């Protein structure tokens, strides 16, 4: 577990303050607001494949599975790259009743995201089509004539097949990520009054719709706040209402309250602008991500008709060219972080909100201050979490190495850009928009129009800037920030521009084989993981060997994930696909200042020994620390050395510490074999600041495998009983003293009792799960009933001297929002039956492109050409 080295004084506040709020269609629900929200995730009938008449009300779907969304069309093994995932049509059908408390409300369904193309039918009638897998869409129910108490049938056809007509457009077999299918994000049922705040995407107005908050004249003494609220009257009569805006602090205590009357004719919309000042504002920053709460209410007299909460952070971000990046009136230093794909072991893109939050926390734990969401807008829950964690975000429009000359394609790209800005514009975490297509040779007029749109959609001071690759037409001379490399700043001819590396850390032999010392599967063990950590440290160091004009970079990529165009998963993560940390995580973590006090992330002094003391371990011992120096003692202090942690100007904050010629297995054997004193074989690293020991890490060689041990990877966030949430439980093979047996080779069988289900089975190598580097993870999904869950683990083939079984208990908590569903989920979805491993080969290959070796070489050479052209060979 990565938390072992953290000081207790830092860890306790982390666990106490780890709070997650999830927005619904742009708003956090506000009690007593008049807006009703239901969780619409449970109770969907699912069928993978096309089937005639599946939209009809009388269609017999009783043989279909009942599942909850977020949902993937097919559970896959943890290593399933190379277009092994299903691509094609999949159907979802939901039988439901409009709740009675929706009487008098305008009822709609808000889909946060479903992959590819979607066609929606209500009660057998086709009502909508949506193109694209990364942005939300809304289905109006009341407009279709349904009323509270009505029994309804919603059918959704999804299709994640390759489609060149809408972004990203690229065929998956030439794509560096995967189009995992399904309704893979949340679905909400929302009831609003006839006079209500509009949805920014539905309103479809430039820099308008919904609630739009921006700030001006920001300092530590004062900030001007502007809140634009669009209200619509869908009724048949003229209404006069009050738009009330309350700025509250993080504890919901009002700081400022303003109200303004507005008269609306039937069918009319109006935007109300409210301006006020905040004295002595608490400014948002990565180290202190303070969030105010804008409470918006629409009132008719004392009755609240509609409302919601928008969380905002007051901060001033400036890119000053050769003077670098400034935050809140001060030089910030380097922005160093990572890219992020929304990919998780087994479930593909179908992460619940809790795992979105945990991912953001893991990235901030690792010392990241900026995340590039590559290559598409991410789940709203991830954006909410970035606000909480103090993670700056570069939001990218969907696209990767593909350009369609049909003018409609460019229009759809620009449409996506407008929608992503309207969705994410209030997040203080958003620092840059990336409105162009990644690594794509698009025409100059496209780049200029994309830039114009970002400025048109956010026309106020302090707006997020636009970033794009310096090699692309129309970018170098026009964009606010250009993507480049360390050293580009030395020859830059535009002093007003800042330079940022969009993807650092890649060192492939070529873009066909992808052999790379920065990519190491956790299963490969100690030596590859150490090489990866040191190689990434070198790349990290390059982000600091620059002038002020170079403002930072994002590592590619912090989480292992599946890809389309290569048979190997991407193994360059500092975490694996289950979010188990590698040595590289500690290399990144050690770059955070020891003095950092963060309200959520792990922080404070740390020291970590990247060495397993095995018979095959190196003689040199590498230690990662953010202290002044490290004292390494071996054999109960028989030998001891102290080395400084180098903090050189123009280099990474804390260089790895390498103790030469420390470990010798034969020397250790003298204690354990000849002296019968194996307890003396240990290493202790002590982090020292100002002459005092502030943190300690101890290693011992693992001895005989005797037992299993489990822990729950909560990150301080409990499992929610909503039928969609899941959590990772990890079983470790240990010796008598609890040292993890990294070289153990076992298969672990998991069972569960109570209100939990195991995701996956033997067909995807999920259960039993092979031990890798000492551990085997399992995914536990909640039911909709809160309660205790007991997880048990034992080795697949038990025996007298086999490791002893173990168990662990956790408890799920109630969901905050009510559910709307009529059918209970079948166990098969959690177990994986029918979802993974079941399709015969002919079904799995149906619809897939089968290439000759010559054809495959040709398309892969084109990918290689584009990646080389855009400079990613560095």
Residue ranges and their predicted role:
Residues 122, 222-263, 272, 619-644, ...:
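Beta-strand-rich binding/interaction modules
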Residues 302, 358-362, 370-586, 602-612:
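Substrate-binding/catalytic cleft of secreted carbohydrate-active enzymes
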